[in-house]
Amino acid sequence: MSGAPIGLFDSGVGGLSIWRQVVHALPSEPLLYVADQAHVPYGHRSAAEIQAHSQAIADYLVAEGCKAIVVACNTASAVALEPLRQRFPQLPILGLEPAVKPAVQLTRSGVVGVMATPATFQGQLYRATVGRYATAVQVVEQVCVGLAELVEQGELEGPDCDARLMGYLEPMLAAGADTIVLGCTHYPFVIESIRRLVGPSMAVVDPAPAVARHLADVLAREGLLAPAERGPLEPASRYRFATTASPSDFNRALSRLVGVSSSSQALIWQQRPDQSPVLHPA
């Protein structure tokens, strides 16, 4: 089991911001990444739909022999993490908790901005995190409609991207925020543009490195780390990717965002007799 892959999934390419940190933290681990680009973004979808698709993707990852799963999507973590843990109690399943706690520790003004999707803000996980760690600060919630789509399209910089970002940033700046939480895995791909627009005095919190460290700790505790004598794996044997949309489009995004050249597998959505979704290779 220790040599089995780690599964990661997101609605699209955003989870690659988590994937690249796992690559650095765990160089001997094989990884299987699934992008549900047929339904990207998850942020405006219903909780029932997000849960159903997350469950089907997890079923696929388990069938592929994954020893652990990372829900590399803030929206899916907010809505589907606990149902997935109940469905697979034998499997370590990690999600993304909004990085409110470190932001509260960093702020000097007492005002923290959070950039996320509507579904993340409405989720119990986010509300519980804010209630636990942020009662002594003001939290400014900024819904970033369309930002995940910009990242999916590869629009990571330029005047149009800057104008869109400033539309999200200005309400937080006006409220006095000096710390901003990136509450969607797509957003780290525009972190340099955000930092340039807000200036060096603003702290921008990307939770991805902490997620990778936590995954390493969990695997070590459960005895699931790949054998140390294996050493770092070659990319061709280490990385597997699958998408529910166009493999060629995903491959281009993969090269653009994380500098990896690979051929992804196409997956298709079908329905079981009870109308629940299921994933199959195309």
Model-derived regions, located:
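Non-catalytic structural scaffold of enzyme domains
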Residues: 1-282
